[in-house]
Curated annotation (Swiss-Prot):
Residues 280-479 form the ABC transmembrane type-1 domain. Its main location: membrane. InterPro entries: MetI-like, MetI-like_sf. GO terms for biological process: peptide transport; protein transport; transmembrane transport. The chain crosses the membrane at residues 12-32, 279-299, 316-336, 359-379, 415-435, 461-481. It is a multi-pass membrane protein. GO terms for cellular component: plasma membrane. It holds the Pfam family BPD_transp_1. This is Oligopeptide transport system permease protein AmiC.
Amino acid sequence: MKKYIFMRVLRSLVSIFLVTTLTYTIIYTLVPRKLIFKQDPNYNKIATTADKRDNYENTVFERMGYIEYYDTKELQEKASSMDSSVTVEANATNKAIYEKYINQLGHGWTLGEFTESGQFYATREIPIFERVFHFYANLIDIDHTNKIQDPENPDLKRYLRFENDPAIGWSLVGSGTKHKYLLYFNSQFPFVHQNFVNLNLGDSYPTYANTPVLQVITQGQGQTKTAQVQFPTGKKTSSVNIYSRTYKSPSQADSREVASYGKDDPYTATESNYQYPSMIVSSAITGLIGLVLAYALAVPLGSAMARFKNTWIDSLSTGALTFLLALPTIALVYIVRLIGSSIALPDSFPILGAGDWRSYVLPAVILGLLGAPGTAIWIRRYMIDLQSQDFVRFARAKGLSEKEISNKHIFKNAMVPLVSGIPAAIIGVIGGATLTETVFAFPGMGKMLIDSVKASNNSMVVGLVFIFTCISIFSRLLGDIWMTIIDPRIKLTEKGGK
C-alpha cells in the first residue's frame, strides 16, 4: 500500500505540474497582455501623458513577470558603471552610451525612447519557460530568521523561541522572519496555525491590486469588523488581526503603530478582520449544505428504487432523475431561482448578504439537486447488482425479510464504491460552483474564477487553477484510502490498484 500511495502521489504531482504549466503558458502567451489594464482604476488617472502611460505599463508588466524594465533613472545608474559621464538627458551622446551598454548586457535587452521627452529606458522580454521556472521556484515560501534584510535596521535581532507573548499568549515567535508568529494557537479552526511554509501564487492584478492571491481568497470580506484587541501595550478597539503581524521597517511605522506595538517592535504590518467569511469559507458553507442535501435525497431514493425495481416507484423515479440529468444546469439554476424568489427567498446574494441564512438557501438547494440524481442512480445500480450475489441468496435462505436484506446487507456493501467519492465531494466544495455562484453573485471561489477571467487577472486565474487541480487530484487519493478503511478487504497495490 505504501508503494501504491507513493506512486499515486508522484503521478498526482506530475498531473498538477502539467495542468498548471499548460494553463500558465496559454494565459501568458495567447491572452493580449494589455487587457490587464481594462479594469485598472489607476490606469487613466496615472497615464495622463504618453510617457507616463508607457512607464506605468512597463512597471506593471515587470511586476506581473512579463518583462524586466529599467526606467530612465535606473538605466542611467546601471550604465554609469560603464561610463560615468552618462546622464538622463535625451541626446546622441547618451544614446550611444546606452546602446553600447545594452549590447554588453545582451540576453534580449532592447533600448527604448519615451515618445514625448525622448529619454531612454530598457526592457527585456522574459521567455515563457523562464517565467514558468520562476513561478515554481517561488511557489513554496519558507520563513526563516534571515528572511528580512533591511538596510535601515541593521541591528535587527534574529531568533526563534517559544514565549508567552503579551498579545496572543504562548506561541513560537520569530525575529528576522517575515511573520511575527510562526506557530500559534487559538479558538479558530483548525486551532493550530503556522506561518513557516506558505504558498506564493503571485500578486493579484488589476482586481485586488498588489494583494497576494492566497490572501485574496482566504481573508474575510465586506466591511472591517472592530472588537477589543489585545495589543502588546494594552487592549484597544480595532479591526486588526493581531495574528497576522509581519515585518515593517521602523522608518515606515506611524505613531499609532508605535503606540500599539511598542517602539522596539518592528512587526507592525497587519491584516484586518472582516464582517463576513472568506471566499473559501463562503463556498464551503453552500457546498457542504448542498452535499448533505444531495446524499439525503439520493440515498433513500436510490435504495427505494433498487428494492422496488420494475415497479411504478422505480419507473417514476428513474424518469424524474433522467429529466434532471438531461436538464441543462443553467436551466435548473434559473428555475430554482424563480421558484425561490416567489417564496421570498433572495435571488441574489447581495440582497441580504452573508449575515442572513436565507442568502445561502437557493445556492445550496441547487447544488443538492445537481448532485442527487447521479448519486441516486449509482446507488440503484450497485444495489441491484448485489441482489443476485450469493450472500443475498444465503440471507433469503435463512428467512430474512427483503427489508432486512436490503437495509443490513445490500445497502452496506453498495455504499463501499460510493464512499470513495465522499472525500472528493467534501474537499471539492472549497472550489465552489462556478455557474451557481456567478448567477447569484455569490462571493465564492467559483465566481472569483469567472471574474478573474473577465478582468484578465492572470495571476488569480493561474492560482485558482492550481488550487482546484490540487484539490481534485488529491481528493481522489483520499477517496481510495477511505474506501480501504470502510472495507478492509480492499487492498491498494500497484498491481491491482492503478
